[in-house]
Each structure stands twice: as structure tokens, then as C-alpha cells.
Swiss-Prot record:
It comes from Thiobacillus denitrificans (strain ATCC 25259 / T1). Gene3D superfamilies: Ribosomal protein S10 domain (3.30.70.600). The gene is rpsJ. Part of the 30S ribosomal subunit. Belongs to the universal ribosomal protein uS10 family. Keywords: Ribonucleoprotein, Ribosomal protein. GO terms for cellular component: ribonucleoprotein complex; ribosome. It holds the Pfam family Ribosomal_S10. Involved in the binding of tRNA to the ribosomes. This is Small ribosomal subunit protein uS10. GO terms for biological process: translation. The keyword GTP-binding does not apply. One of its GO terms (molecular function) is structural constituent of ribosome.
Length: 102
């Protein structure tokens, strides 16, 4: 696998989980001899919801809820076969969504 790169995008609602997962991926890739660029923090998307507190009147009284989606981006340059095998065997937490592009 010469002159290739693996691009890894992580998504999670909890920033501690995503940072821990990114650190595991970086350590695994460096242990197998690959060069890692990142993790680069991408903008956090915030989705807000306004809900009426009362079922009948008082429209001016509302609750506000939000979901924050944290994202990270990493590039693994010149990966070896060992790197790919180690990344496939890596066990990440359930709250982290991983996208891998070769």
C-alpha cells in the first residue's frame, strides 16, 4: 500500500468518548509504523429543540433542549498491512460512529 492514506472520521455525542477513541486509533497506528495526521477537531454541530412546557396555555414558557455532535478527522499516511489489521481489530466504545475511507 504505497502512497495511500486512510481517512478516519469519528462522530459522537460525548466529547470524552471521541477523544479517547481518537487516542486509541493514533496509538495503534503509530505502533505499527504509520504516520498519523490529526486528530483534527471539526466544528461541533448543535441541534436545538424548543418544547412547550404547558400542554394548554402559556406559549411563552418553553423548554430548550440541544444535541451536540462532536467530530474528529484523522489521516493515516502510508499504512502497512499490519496497520489495517490492527485498526480492524480495534474495539471502540458503542457511542462512537467511525467512517473509514481508503
Amino acid at each position: 500500500m504505497q502512497n495511500q492514506k486512510i481517512r478516519i472520521r469519528l462522530k459522537a455525542f460525548d466529547y470524552k468518548l471521541i477523544d479517547q477513541s481518537a487516542l486509541e486509533i493514533v496509538e495503534t497506528a503509530k505502533r505499527t509504523g504509520a504516520v498519523v495526521k490529526g486528530p483534527v477537531p471539526l466544528p461541533t454541530s448543535i441541534e436545538r429543540f424548543d418544547v412547550l412546557r404547558s400542554p394548554h396555555v402559556n406559549k411563552s414558557s418553553r423548554d430548550q433542549f440541544e444535541i451536540r455532535t462532536h467530530r474528529r478527522l484523522m489521516d493515516i499516511m502510508d499504512p502497512t498491512d499490519k496497520t489495517v489489521d490492527a485498526l480492524m481489530k480495534l474495539d471502540l466504545p458503542a457511542g462512537v460512529d467511525v467512517e473509514i475511507k481508503l
